């Protein structure tokens, strides 16, 4: 699905991810939290490479994380 739909679902409490990810993104404390495969959890606003992180938003293969 496109990110705009995934974002709405995330705001409703769903966790979202891309097919190759082991981690997921979730809406927590009024921000997107990145739950990485290595158990690191970080606020999207604290990402080191904003361009890399936001390039995912252009993708159309978002999934609900189970």
Per-region residue spans from a language model:
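Surface-exposed ligand/attachment interfaces on beta-rich extracellular proteins
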Residues: 1-8
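Acidic, low-complexity, intrinsically disordered interaction modules
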Residues: 25-53
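Short, structured beta-strand segments at or near domain termini in extracellular proteins/domains
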Residues: 55-65
């Amino acid at each position: 699905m496109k990110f705009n739909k995934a974002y709405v679902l995330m705001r409703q409490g769903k966790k979202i991810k891309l097919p190759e990810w082991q981690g997921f993104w979730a809406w927590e404390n009024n921000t997107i939290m990145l739950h990485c495969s290595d158990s690191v959890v970080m606020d999207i606003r604290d990402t080191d490479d904003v361009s890399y992180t936001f390039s995912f938003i252009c993708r159309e293969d978002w999934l609900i994380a189970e």
